């Protein structure tokens, strides 16, 4: 999420301004962050949509026809959530691009059956609200208390003007959470 914000200077400025009222000398106003920072929330959901590459496992409880395939009772079905998050019918034609406004323009997307960053059913993450609040407070402190920007150095993984290139995600494996960048691709 930090990388997506840092690589877009307009978004960086917008997030800094949006979270500013939540950062107080004695701490964070979490209520403000959760209820008044719609751009931050949209960035959070979009980052989760693009980087969450885990699986959901369900047991087939009765014979079920899926397309032309019969799933027998007792078998397990494994579903990669990243495929749900790449549904063009739900998320639009630019599914592989980070769109910081995707969930701002369509708040209903966060409740879509194709958006499962925290699992679902009995495996719905009980810590999802806490995790979101921790991430929001980290972002608020990071961008409010310090003037953070990308380093400009020549070398590998840099553009011709010395800017760091966006980290490439390691999409080669399913994870238990967020996809890591390829080795050497950290921000």
Label for each model-derived stretch:
Residues 21-69, 109:
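Conserved cytochrome P450 K-helix E-x-x-R motif and the immediately C-terminal K′/meander segment
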Residues 11, 128-174:
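Cytochrome P450 heme-binding "Cys pocket" and the immediately downstream C-terminal segment
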Residues 79-107:
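Conserved cytochrome P450 K-helix/beta-meander segment immediately N-terminal to the heme-binding cysteine loop
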Residues 1-21, 78, 127, 135:
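Central I-helix of cytochrome P450 enzymes
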Residues 106-117:
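Active-site-adjacent bridging/hinge elements
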Residues 168, 172-187:
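C-terminal helix/juxtamembrane-tail motif
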């Amino acid at each position: 999420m930090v990388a997506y914000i840092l690589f877009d200077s307009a978004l960086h400025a917008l997030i800094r301004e949006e979270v500013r009222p939540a950062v107080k000398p004695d701490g964070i106003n979490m209520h403000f962050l959760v209820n008044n920072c719609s751009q931050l929330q949209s960035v959070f959901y979009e980052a989760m949509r693009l980087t969450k590459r885990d699986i959901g496992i369900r047991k087939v409880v009765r014979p079920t026809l899926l397309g032309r395939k019969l799933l027998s009772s007792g078998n397990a079905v494994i579903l990669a959530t990243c495929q749900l998050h790449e549904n063009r019918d739900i998320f639009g034609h630019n599914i592989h691009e980070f769109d910081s406004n995707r969930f701002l323009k369509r708040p209903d997307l966060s409740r879509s059956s194709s958006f499962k960053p925290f699992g679902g059913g009995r495996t719905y993450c009980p810590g999802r609200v806490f995790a979101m609040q921790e991430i929001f407070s980290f972002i608020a402190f990071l961008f409010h208390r310090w003037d953070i920007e990308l380093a400009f150095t020549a070398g590998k993984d840099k553009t011709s003007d010395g800017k760091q290139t966006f980290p490439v995600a390691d999409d080669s494996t399913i994870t238990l959470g967020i996809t890591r960048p390829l080795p050497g691709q950290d921000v």
